[in-house]
């Protein structure tokens, strides 16, 4: 029982950081520019559900896949660390894109953003998947495994709420 709180804090901080709902928000707003509230809410709902289900699949099947392919947990920890380092390094090297799309292309592209790129890889990327597999491996008791699942659900619920908060234009926004 004494390991439960530190494990829960580790799970929450690592998943909230890797999921990065606050960093995803500007991308979400840019990609859904021109959509109405109903369309944005549907995209947010679909993206968070797909992200949660994808992460649960890897959380429960990760160790089986390791055994099947002969990968050790420690080797995967090292590879996962490199992935997380690369993600962080890429964030430091952010570049502005001058890509322009026609209105028809934007609508076609925006119809699919809930799965790719919003759910996978932004909300449920390789870092989050590696983290879920490793934390499930570390969870030695049923209560720790339940805590991990609950924390993952909590993080995606918070992500859903953060994105939902920004689906409606602000009443103080002069553009609306």
Please give the residue ranges for each predicted region.
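Interfacial loop-to-helix junctions that mark the boundaries of transmembrane helices
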Residues: 2-5, 68-77, 140-150
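Single conserved hydrophobic/aromatic residue that forms the stacking wall/gate
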Residues: 166, 171-176
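Small-residue-enriched transmembrane helix starts and helix-helix packing motifs
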Residues: 1-17, 94-95, 101-119
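Juxtamembrane transmembrane-helix termini in multi-pass membrane transport proteins
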Residues: 7-57
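Membrane helix-loop-helix hairpins that form the core translocation module of multi-pass transporters
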Residues: 41-95
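Generic transmembrane alpha-helix signature in multi-pass membrane proteins
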Residues: 13-16, 25-32, 116-121, 129-138
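A small-residue-rich subset of transmembrane alpha-helices
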Residues: 37-63, 139-168
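Structural signature of hydrophobic alpha-helical transmembrane segments
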Residues: 10-22, 74-82, 148-159
């Amino acid at each position: 029982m004494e390991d439960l709180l530190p494990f829960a804090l580790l799970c929450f901080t690592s998943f909230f950081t890797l999921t990065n709902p606050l960093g995803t928000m500007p991308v979400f707003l840019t990609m859904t520019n021109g959509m109405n509230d109903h369309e944005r809410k549907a995209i947010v709902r679909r993206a968070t559900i797909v992200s949660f289900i994808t992460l649960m699949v890897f959380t429960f099947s990760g160790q089986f896949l390791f055994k099947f392919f002969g990968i050790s947990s420690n080797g995967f920890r090292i590879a996962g660390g490199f992935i997380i380092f690369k993600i962080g390094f890429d964030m430091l090297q952010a570049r502005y894109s001058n890509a322009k799309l026609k209105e028809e292309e934007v609508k076609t592209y925006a119809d699919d953003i809930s799965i790719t790129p919003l759910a996978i890889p932004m909300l449920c990327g390789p870092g989050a998947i590696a983290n879920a597999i490793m934390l499930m491996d570390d969870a030695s008791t049923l209560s720790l495994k339940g805590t991990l699942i609950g924390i993952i659900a909590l993080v995606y619920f918070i992500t859903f709420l953060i994105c939902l908060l920004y689906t409606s234009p602000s009443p103080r926004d002069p553009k609306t």
